[in-house]
């Protein structure tokens, strides 16, 4: 079965055991790509099991995909951040890591802006080069921006938490609805893989390093510690529903079909 996820340390750490057959589960063919590329691919038949931004899922993917409970990314203090070269108001041209990423959705909490889409790992350099005025950072960017001389303007996750009083759901693992019969076993395999990662944290070190954008071991360790947590074992369904409802009220998402289950 094709299994698509990102090359970021939290994913390669969490799914290493499943990909390498170290836990019971289906044999998988991994496909690693940037989260926005995964979001786009999720709308195609090629996506059998895939990581997908919650925001992208809500943009009309619910009719073809259903969410699994294990393997997602959520929590407190995990949100995207807006940074710039110096302290200023959020505005001007803002780089985002994709139109349908959860990061882009969360930026709407602050208003409507002129945005420029680029790969998440190019945003810091674009700000430093003056190509954009601000940028929304995800993944390792939370840990590297200060070292590059950038300044924090807003933590979008904190804004969400203060408004919604629940963890921030960033992404989930989804499976095609026509493969629903395989969903429970895949969900169990994901959970087993995450538990294996917790129990054997050094086992995936080489795999994680081979795919990481940021090679600093300290950054990689901090990334994993923050993003791989109890919600990776079981995504908070209430938090996901809060995000979908908020997006519908904002007019960002189409109304979800109430007859289609959100989770397996």
Language-model regions, residue ranges each:
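Bilobed "Venus flytrap"/periplasmic-binding protein-like clamshell domains
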Residues: 1-20, 32, 78-133, 140, ...
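A structural signal for short loop-to-beta-strand junctions that line the ligand-binding cleft
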Residues: 1-2, 64-73, 93
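Beta->alpha turn/N-cap motifs
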Residues: 10, 34-36, 45-58, 119-120, ...
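Alpha-to-beta junction loops
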Residues: 25, 43-52, 112-114, 128-137
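Hydrophobic/proline-rich hinge and linker segments of small-molecule sensing/allosteric domains
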Residues: 67-87, 160-178
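Pocket-lining segment of extracytoplasmic ligand-binding domains
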Residues: 120-209
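Secondary-structure end/capping motifs
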Residues: 180-246, 250
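Conserved C-terminal helix/tail region of periplasmic/extracytoplasmic solute-binding proteins
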Residues: 250-264
């Amino acid at each position: 079965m094709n299994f698509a996820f990102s090359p970021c340390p939290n994913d390669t750490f969490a799914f290493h055991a499943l990909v390498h057959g170290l836990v019971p589960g289906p044999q998988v063919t991994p496909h690693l790509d940037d989260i926005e590329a995964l979001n786009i691919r999720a709308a195609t038949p090629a996506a059998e099991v895939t990581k997908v931004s919650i925001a992208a899922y809500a943009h009309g993917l619910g009719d073809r995909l259903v969410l699994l409970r294990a393997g997602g990314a959520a929590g407190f203090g995990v949100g995207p951040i807006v940074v710039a070269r110096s302290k200023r108001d959020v505005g001007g041209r803002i780089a985002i890591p994709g139109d349908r990423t959860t990061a882009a959705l969360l930026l709407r909490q602050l208003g409507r802006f002129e945005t420029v889409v680029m790969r998440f790992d190019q945003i810091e350099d674009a700000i430093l080069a003056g190509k954009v005025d601000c940028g929304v950072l995800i993944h390792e960017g939370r840990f590297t921006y200060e070292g590059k001389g950038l300044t924090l303007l807003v933590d979008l996750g904190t804004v969400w938490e203060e408004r919604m009083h629940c963890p921030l759901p960033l992404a989930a693992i989804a499976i095609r609805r026509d493969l629903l019969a395989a969903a429970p076993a895949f969900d169990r395999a994901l959970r087993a893989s995450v538990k294996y990662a917790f129990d054997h944290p050094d086992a995936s070190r080489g795999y994680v390093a081979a795919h990481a954008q940021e090679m600093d071991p300290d950054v990689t360790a901090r990334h994993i510690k923050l993003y791989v947590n109890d919600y990776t074992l079981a995504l908070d369904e209430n938090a996901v529903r809060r995000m979908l409802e908020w997006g519908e009220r904002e007019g960002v998402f189409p109304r979800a079909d109430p007859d289609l289950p959100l989770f397996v």
